[in-house]
Curated annotation (Swiss-Prot):
Gene designation: aurF
EC id: 1.-.-.-
Pathway of action: Pigment biosynthesis
Residues linked to a glycan: 59
Keyword field contains Repressor: no
Organism: Gibberella zeae (strain ATCC MYA-4620 / CBS 123657 / FGSC 9075 / NRRL 31084 / PH-1)
Induction of expression: Expression is regulated by the aurofusarin biosynthesis cluster-specific transcription factor aurR1/GIP2.
Protein name in UniProt: Monooxygenase aurF
Length: 527
């Protein structure tokens, strides 16, 4: 019997790791991408494409931000520039022999499930065959992420504005706005990056935002800010999150709040406070924003309310500003209707989401564990609708391992009623968060999701690093390495150390030891 065929739509970081993990488990998987390269948004390109800017820098360190079985090169800086991540993804594809299974310059137009054939019919085209044609696959993974369609809030009077108006998706060359007065809309990582990129060359940058933000630097006391996580701390925090979520939230907000205020002298007029809770939104990571605000090259304003005339805008507090350009750094949304209305995970989502205070325009799809279609859990998955305080490459490596394992052995799926209940509970939690303010709809309860994925992929970590017979045996047999696993920097490679359902990586042990030795030599012992 031939291996099941799988189409993976998108060959950025999400698609590549999914392709690798599915092929590793014996699936006849291919990746499809309209571009002539792999790497997705990490491959810089001019024009109206969603890509990084040339100056983009990773928000997480190389030690924490890699895939589970493929470290960044040793000579990489601790925070990787966009060009380095693009190269890393291409090296990943070559190392695991993925390129021969990548169909580039292939545009995806839609998919429909055929009940008779029990297969998915995909509509595809290429430059050589521009007319869409059909191809059949047993399973489909959408790995295009949640950032697909630019989101632009309606601004009263915008048609009167005679200056430059652009969404961050297509803005790649800050030099075009040199000497201009620019208003940047938004208060996330993209808005902060755009504003600080423009600050040295623009006449004035206004950063317009409606709410506060948690801002953290990349470096604290000479160490990468994410070099605090150990497995022991992870277990303790997960227990708090599960059994005393209110205390966990209060503790995390307090710890991060102290870090922020010990690092930066935040002025009230910058309006970082009140910041959203860490449960609602991930921190903004930027090293240049505060210095630019201090110098006055960036001025923090209230949110843009309306355009008055060809160059005059008014913010929600009634202040008026003369500007030459407006940049929308207001995020993206996603359209899942490409799988047909019968399978669109957003078609029957709760209307309470759109009514909530924290609704940001993004949909809230009904996906089991934020991955699997409830209509076709054994054949349709979405990689990218997932967010919590963990590095993205690591999270989606785990998520795609879960897809591979559950599609390999579907008996691991709970009943349809149980899957629906999990989604109902997840949505109720997200909507409750949205009562406090803006919330990322892809956010999940970290402790519950990690416990689930540990079990599904068979990582072996809870058994070998817990108070079990396997745990005691591991400690007695390999005490030094056990101690590194428990109290050294928690590495993504830990999830490939022990044998289990997913494939272990023989190099995981050496990689963890080498990484911790290098980290200690350069930064000292773990705090």
């Amino acid at each position: 019997m031939p291996n099941p065929t799988v189409a993976i739509v998108g060959l950025g970081a999400l698609g590549l790791v999914t392709l690798k993990n599915l092929r590793e488990e014996g699936f006849d998987a291919v990746g499809l991408d309209r571009n002539d390269y792999v790497g997705g948004l990490w491959h810089f390109e001019e024009g109206n494409k969603l890509t990084v800017m040339r100056s983009t820098l990773s928000n997480g360190s190389k030690q924490r931000g890699c895939f589970t079985d493929f470290p960044f090169p040793e000579d990489s800086p601790d925070f990787i520039p966009a060009e380095g991540i693009d190269r890393y993804l291409k090296d990943y594809a070559k190392h695991f022999g993925l390129l021969e299974h990548c169909r580039l310059r292939t545009s995806f137009h839609g998919a429909r499930y055929d009940e008779k054939k029990q297969q998915w019919r995909l509509s595809l085209s290429t430059p050589d065959a521009p007319e869409p044609h059909f191809e059949w696959f047993d399973k489909v993974v959408f790995a295009m992420g949640a950032d697909q369609i630019p989101s632009r809030p309606k601004i009263e009077g915008i048609e009167k504005f005679k200056g430059h108006v652009e969404h961050s998706m297509s803005f790649k060359n800050p030099e075009t706005l040199a000497g201009k007065r620019v208003m940047v809309l938004g208060f996330g990582n993209t808005a902060a990056d755009m504003a600080t990129e423009l600050a040295p060359i623009a006449d004035q940058v206004y950063l317009a935002h409606r709410h506060g933000a948690i801002i953290v630097p990349r470096w604290v006391k000479g160490k990468p800010v994410d070099h605090v996580r150990t497995y022991r701390k992870y277990v303790i925090l997960n227990l708090m999150n599960r059994y005393t979520p209110g205390l966990w939230e209060k503790t995390m907000n307090s710890v991060i709040g102290k870090l922020v205020h010990n690092t930066f002298d935040l002025k009230p007029e910058w309006r970082f406070d009140p910041a959203p809770s860490i449960t609602n939104q991930r921190p903004l990571v930027n090293d240049e924003l505060i210095p630019s605000l201090e110098k006055g090259s960036i001025i923090s304003t209230h949110g843009l309310a309306r355009v008055i005339d060809e160059n005059t805008v008014e913010t929600s507090d009634g202040q008026r500003y003369e500007v030459d350009a407006i940049l929308f750094c207001t995020g993206f949304t996603v359209d899942y209707s490409v799988v047909g209305m019968d399978a669109d995970p957003c078609r029957a989502t709760t209307t309470d989401w759109q009514k909530s205070r924290g609704f940001t325009g993004r949909p809230l799809p009904r996906l089991y564990q934020n991955i699997f279609s409830l209509d076709h859990p054994e054949t349709l998955a979405f990689i990218g609708h997932l967010s919590f305080m963990n590095p993205a490459f690591f999270m989606f490596d785990l998520a795609s391992m879960a897809v591979a394992q559950l599609w390999k052995d579907p008996s691991g799926f709970p009943s349809k009623a149980e899957m629906n209940k999990q989604v109902d509970d997840q949505h109720a939690w997200v909507i409750d968060l949205a009562k406090k303010g803006p919330v990322t709809p892809s956010i999940v309860k970290a402790s519950e999701w990690m416990e689930w994925v540990d079990r599904v992929i068979g990582s072996g970590l809870p058994e070998h690093l817990g108070y079990t017979m396997k745990g005691w045996n591991f400690w007695m047999r390999d005490r030094k390495f056990c101690n590194i696993m428990m109290d050294g920097l928690l590495s993504p490679h830990a999830y490939r150390v022990f044998p289990g359902k997913r494939k272990a990586w023989p190099g995981a042990r050496d990689a963890i030891i080498a990484m911790n030795a290098d980290r200690e030599a350069r930064f000292g012992p773990m705090d």
